[in-house]
C-alpha cells in the first residue's frame, strides 16, 4: 500500500535500508533488555520462566 505512494527511487532506498534498520532494531532491543532487569523480561519466555520458580 505504501509503495503506491512512493516512487521507484524511494522504493529502492527503502529496500536497501530494511536490513540495516532491522539490525539496529535488534541491537536496540537487546540493549534495552540488557539495561533493564533480565528477569523481568525473561519471565515472559515460557522455558526460562520455569527456571525462576519462587520458593513459597
Curated annotation (Swiss-Prot):
Bilayer topology term: Single-pass membrane protein
Record topological domains on the Mitochondrial intermembrane side: 36-56
Listed GO CC annotations: mitochondrial inner membrane; respiratory chain complex III
UniProt xrefs under Gene3D superfamilies: 1.20.5.220
TM region positions: 13-35
InterPro entries in UniProt: Single_a-helix_sf (IPR029027), UQCR (IPR015089)
Record keyword Electron transport present: yes
Family in the record: Belongs to the UQCR11/QCR10 family.
Subunit note: Component of the ubiquinol-cytochrome c oxidoreductase (cytochrome b-c1 complex, complex III, CIII), a multisubunit enzyme composed of 11 subunits. The complex is composed of 3 respiratory subunits cytochrome b, cytochrome c1 and Rieske protein UQCRFS1, 2 core protein subunits UQCRC1/QCR1 and UQCRC2/QCR2, and 6 low-molecular weight protein subunits UQCRH/QCR6, UQCRB/QCR7, UQCRQ/QCR8, UQCR10/QCR9, UQCR11/QCR10 and subunit 9, the cleavage product of Rieske protein UQCRFS1.
Protein name, UniProt field: Cytochrome b-c1 complex subunit 10
The encoding gene: UQCR11
Amino acid at each position: 500500500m505504501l509503495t503506491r505512494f512512493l516512487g521507484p527511487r524511494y522504493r529502492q532506498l527503502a529496500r536497501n535500508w530494511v536490513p540495516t534498520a532491522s539490525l539496529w532494531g535488534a541491537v536496540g532491543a537487546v540493549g534495552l533488555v540488557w539495561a533493564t532487569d533480565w528477569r523481568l523480561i525473561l519471565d515472559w519466555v515460557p522455558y526460562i520462566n520455569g527456571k525462576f520458580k519462587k520458593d513459597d
